[in-house]
């Protein structure tokens, strides 16, 4: 009898966790398309402060922290970025000790080292190889890890050409990540990561002055999410201006 009650209790907890996880994903997506980073931070901090988190929820939290850190660096809010990099690393250490989805864990380590470079470019020669190594190890563990391909793309995108960086090579990695993401149509529905990847592709095509492709991807994004503020109000008008001229 006690075992039956225990099983039912665990099932209820898991069901509640799944529902909360789904709600968090939707709320983060809505914050992303509206550029509501205050709302994003509120969701992220609430999850961080939960006493008990499953491995799945903890990995999702790292994803939200990853997105927020990138925004902080873009806004030159270095102290905030450093704070959340530290939190994300602690969360990854827990996941690594639990031997949970190590391919994703390594891909996030690669991303965090990339952020370290963004905060201090002079550290690039020392940190850059670590970022690359983690991304490569992530792919060794799982060739189907789209996020690891995205990180390989980021490494190529931000690495100076004198050190081997290439925007065209970055595009190749981004497109590979896109193919892998799109294999599971359900997971990319209302997924900020998918829109973010498509936006990176727009930016990369713009950088190599392939405005036709950049325009096409802007229109793909707006078809998926017409209310995506960053594309609708900023990138698409900029791309159209370049395309027409």
Residue map of PLM features:
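Amphipathic alpha-helical repeat scaffolds of TPR domains
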Residues: 23-27, 52-74, 100-119, 144-161, ...
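Short coil/turn connectors between adjacent alpha-helices in alpha-solenoid helical repeat scaffolds
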Residues: 28-35, 70-83, 115-128, 158-171, ...
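TPR/TPR-like alpha-solenoid helical repeat scaffolds
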Residues: 187-203, 229-245
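Flexible helix-coil transition and linker loops at the boundaries of alpha-helical arrays
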Residues: 46-60, 91-105, 136-145, 178-191
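Bacterial N-terminal signal peptides that target proteins for export
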Residues: 1-8
